[in-house]
Amino acid sequence: LLQRLNRIKQVGLSSVVYPGAQHTRFQHSLGAFYLMSEAITQLASKGNFIFDSEAEAVQAAILLHDIGHGPFSHVLEDTIVKGVSHEEISLMLMERMNREMNGQLSLAIQIFKDEYPKRFLHQLVSGQLDMDRLDYLRRDSFYTGVSEGNIGSARIIKMLDVADDHLVVESKGIYSIENFLTARRLMYWQVYLHKTSVAYERML
C-alpha cells in the first residue's frame, strides 16, 4: 500500500505549470517520517516523557497518513467516492492492516483518530504545525522552484514543546511561525490554487 504512493505525484496536476514537480507522495511520507523522528527526539530532550511504543506509533501514523490518496492526489478525492476524504480512506486502510498485523497498529490508529490522551502526538500528525505540512511546504517549494515556500522546518521543530498535553511553541519561535504561515499562504496562491492547474483539474 505504501509503495503505491510512488506512482502518485505529490502536487497532482501542478506539474503542468511547474515541470519539475515530479515528486511523489511516497517521498513526502518518508520526509514526514524523518521530521517526526526529529520532533520526538527534540521533545524528549526537553523533558517530555514519550514511551518507545508511543514514538513508534506516531511514526507509523505519519508514515501511513497519506495511503488513502488516489490517482492524481487530491484531484479525484471527491469524485471517485463522494463525501469521503482521503483521511477516511487512510484510516480504513490502516484498520485493515491492523487486523492483518494482529493489532500492532492499534496505538497508531488511536493517535491518528485523536483518541489518545497525549493530544500533542495527534497534533504532530495532524495539526496547524504538523510534520505533514512542515515537509510538504519545503518539498513542494524545492521541486516547483517557488522559493516563498522554503520554510525553516528544523528551526520550528527546535522551538516545539508540550504544555498540558498540547503542542506549543516557545516564544522565541514566533517569527519562524509567522514565516511558516506566510509561506503556506503564498504556496496556495502560487502553486496549489494556480489557475492553470485548477483548470486542468476541472477538465479531468
Regions found by a protein language model. Name each.
Residues 1-60, 68-203:
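Sequence-structural signature of the catalytic-core scaffold of metal-dependent phosphohydrolases
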